[in-house]
């Protein structure tokens, strides 16, 4: 159960800021927490400023096992505490106090505006390891729907066909270790920080927030089980998926120089590597603060190839763990449509500037399952209820 250890934290607005007379780091604040009088608080956060709305723990508030009380700090009494997201326990961000949008009323309980109270189910994946569809929350929801006879809610998706008249991205699969590669280019991206509830959900699932675009790809990987990668479009113009004849070194997003051999599949900008397929992107093409145009990748790669590459590189990632399980290639385009929908929801000024560029190296044959009720009845020795079982299979 998440969030149950937190109470009494409200929206507080900083009305005045004075430097502490004896400390370069501390500030003397007056906080409007929706009460009749302003509250005196001592705070050392670097981002304090007049007008900022933040998470304010009033006297009597509880954060874990700590109860907030009036406290003397460097000669002044602090009647509460301005909190970072890390101190509240909703992310690992302790760079400064939490920043809340101006439209929220002072004194509002944080739990009334954010999904802090939540229940997290931990599923042991030992029983799911050979079910790639269960490596995302939606797959688990599908199982629950089938078992309980409930309707599975569909994804909200963007209509990618609306962009069919736009230019295609210059992309080519040159190695069949990539089964399917789908990509889309989006520009006019203005938002850098993810919505609070998205950051909370990521944190509760064990992932840290990075920036909006990276967070959104991670969010959808957890939701759908389909890894994606966002490139800075300034660094990626001609996408080629291939291997190289000679070994070389490649610096990944974590800043590590890795030795790439001729068996490792790479995503390239022309002949320049920009990502290790199915494992991790490159540092030179990462999304940065001034990125306004991205090229979004959603693909499926040969599971054995990804597994062997992770062993050679001694580097296993959340993405590679999923690619190692033979992901469904039919999910790549759905994931892009979901990404664009959510991106538009929180950054409405974005503009899709390419059509969906989608290539198969090869396709699996379509499999149709026939349900023979009489055979199942004879085989199991019981009479099955057709409607119940068929609905479960359809789900």
What are these regions (language model features)?
Residues 80, 270-364:
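Mobile "lid/hinge" segments at catalytic clefts and subdomain interfaces of large enzymes
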Residues 19, 27, 152-249:
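Glycine/proline-enriched, intrinsically flexible loops and inter-domain linkers
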Residues 152-169, 350-375:
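Terminal amphipathic helices with adjacent charged low-complexity linkers/tails
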Residues 388-395:
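Conserved small/polar residues in nucleotide/adenosyl-binding loops
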């Amino acid at each position: 159960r998440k969030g149950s250890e937190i109470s009494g934290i409200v929206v507080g607005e900083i009305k005045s800021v004075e430097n502490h007379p004896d400390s370069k780091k501390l500030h003397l604040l007056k906080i409007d927490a929706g009460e009749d009088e302003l509250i005196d608080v001592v705070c050392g956060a670097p981002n304090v400023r007049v007008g900022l709305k933040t998470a304010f723990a009033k006297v009597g508030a509880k954060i874990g096992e700590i109860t907030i009380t009036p406290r003397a700090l460097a000669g002044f009494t602090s009647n509460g505490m301005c909190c970072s997201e890390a101190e509240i326990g909703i992310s690992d961000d302790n760079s400064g106090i939490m920043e809340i949008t101006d439209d929220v009323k002072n004194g509002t309980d944080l739990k009334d505006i954010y999904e802090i109270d939540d229940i997290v189910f931990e599923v042991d994946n030992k029983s799911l390891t050979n079910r790639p569809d269960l490596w995302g929350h939606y797959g688990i929801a599908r199982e629950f729907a089938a078992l309980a006879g409930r309707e599975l809610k569909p994804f909200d998706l963007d209509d990618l066909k609306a962009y069919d008249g736009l230019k295609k991205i210059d992309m080519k699969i040159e190695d069949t270790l990539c089964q399917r590669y789908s990509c889309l280019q989006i520009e006019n991206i203005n938002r850098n920080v993810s919505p609070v509830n998205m950051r909370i959900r990521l944190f509760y699932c064990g992932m840290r927030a990075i920036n909006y675009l990276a967070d959104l790809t991670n969010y959808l990987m957890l939701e759908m089980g389909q890894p994606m990668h966002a490139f800075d479009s300034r660094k990626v113009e001609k996408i080629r998926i291939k291997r190289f004849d000679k070994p070389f070194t490649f610096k990944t997003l974590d800043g590590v120089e890795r030795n790439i051999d001729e068996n490792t599949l790479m995503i390239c900008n022309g002949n320049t590597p920009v990502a290790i397929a199915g494992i991790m992107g490159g540092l030179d093409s990462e999304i940065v603060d001034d990125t306004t145009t991205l090229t979004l990748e959603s693909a499926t790669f040969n599971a054995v190839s990804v597994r062997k590459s992770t062993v050679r590189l001694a580097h296993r990632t959340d993405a590679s763990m999923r690619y190692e399980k033979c992901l469904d290639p039919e999910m790549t385009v759905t994931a892009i449509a979901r990404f664009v929908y959510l991106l538009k929801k929180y950054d409405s000024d974005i503009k899709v500037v390419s059509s969906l560029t989608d290539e198969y190296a090869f396709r699996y044959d379509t499999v149709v399952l026939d349900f023979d009720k009489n055979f199942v009845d004879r085989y199991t020795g019981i009479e099955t209820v057709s409607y119940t079982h068929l609905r479960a299979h359809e789900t």
